[in-house]
Amino acid sequence: VAQTRVTQSALAGIQASDTLRVGAYFNAAPFTWLNERGEVDGYEADIINAIAIELGLTVEFVQVTRQNDDEMLLSGAVDVLIGQQARSHDREAIFDFSHPYYVNEHRMVIRQGEPYGSLEQLAGHAIAVEIGSRSERALRRWSEARGVPFEIVTYLSERAALDALAAHEVDGMVGLLDSLRRAGRQQMSLVNEPVMVEPYAIVLRRADNNFRRLLDRSLQRLKASGRLEQIYAEWFGAEPMDFVTLVPVYDDLYEDTRGVDDFAREVPLPAYPVRERLASGQPLRVAGIAAEGQDAPAVVRLMNGLNRALVEEMARRWNTTVEYVPDSVTDPAALVASGAADLAVGVYPRWSGADEFDYSLPYLMHGDRLLVPANSRLSGFQDMLGTNWIIGYFADDPDGEEQVMKYAEHFNVGQNLRTFQITRESDAIYTMTVEDNISAIFGDSLRLQALMRESDPST
């Protein structure tokens, strides 16, 4: 693929024409295809149409193929690509991607009853793939990365590869999970371990950051309104998909009232190019690690350990070292925006900062939880029948008591319980399990997990 430096955003043409030109495969059902009425249809087509409605644009679908799609995008013939467009490390060197909205898997199929519980157990066996497919590349990469050899046998189609498995010509077959499900083959089963996970997203030209933010804002609004899940259910029914992780909804999302014409057409170079710094041998500067004094809460120690392990593994893979920026907990993202840090951990994404820096996908989710003794019959507020339930909350949580009562009223058990203020975090579990003065502890799940780990390191 010939890569050229783009100096103007796709927004220039979109703003001039009020039209979004979408490159799409016309034969990739149920994601994008041309239906019997001559209309582009499918899950991704519906997402694009919903985005266009949200932005006040008209959609023009342009047919592309797997041979010319990349060139069509890079040349400016289309503004975006859709249709099982896989977000991969290789492609990220050339393109940018929106939030992913579907996760597929390349999976190994075996005959039902065969004794293969993992991919490694099929080492040396004949495995069928469709020739030239992404599944063939995924299997070869998995094999090379792990040093596990397969006899890879290619067929002209997925159907022919499945037929070969049924006829005992091979012992396994690798294909895309959604396609394998639609094939509906009897007497076959899946090996639990995926060969490769493949997220699908909207593809746009690299470094077109303003356009990408506009697309991501629309996807987040579709997620926040429930429309994204509705579109998904229309095509895939009850098949699970983790949209909470795939399309995170940032704080203050709806406070951004800008329209399409308000986004800049230019594609600016980054003010502080991190890759160049790392390539020159300088360390990765990380903000957001808290100081661990004697009185530091347990959750600080837990999160510091997790965040250090995360960034140090990243640095190892990037062949660089880590430098932790001191006194950087108050606003670590601002240090990234100013160039004083390369990366910030433990950041809550907010849309008002999206023009200054990029966020990764979430790597940790947390929320309100109840911690109860191991032998308790409580699984939640709904079990607090009768009276004399005492729920502890932390004194330094300004909304703790109010939140306890809100949950209690929601489950119609407000009259059955009373609250207890925990002034010393270190006493919380002892008060519940030894003194038996409270029935449960209410708090943030990370804080409760940290207390559990320090009380019993085996948890």
Where are these regions (language model features)?
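A ligand-binding cleft/hinge motif common to bilobed small-molecule-binding domains
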Residues: N68-E71, Q84-I94, A138-S143, L162-M196, ...
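N-terminal hydrophobic or amphipathic helices and topogenic motifs
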Residues: V1-V64, A224-T330, A337-A340, R377-D383, ...
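Flexible hinge/capping segments at coil-to-helix
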Residues: H99, I110-I127, L361, V372-I391
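Beta->alpha turn/N-cap motifs
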Residues: G23-A29, V62-Q67, G76-S88, Q112, ...
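Ligand-binding cleft/hinge of the Venus flytrap
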Residues: W33-N35, I48-T58, S135-T154, R185, ...
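Periplasmic-binding protein-like
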Residues: F26, Y101-I110, L177, R181-L219, ...
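Ligand-binding clefts/hinges and TM-proximal coupling segments of bilobed small-molecule sensing domains
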Residues: T4-R5, R134-V153, Q187-L190, Q220-V267, ...
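Short helix-initiation/N-cap motifs at beta->coil->alpha
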Residues: T7, E60-E71, E114, E151-A164, ...
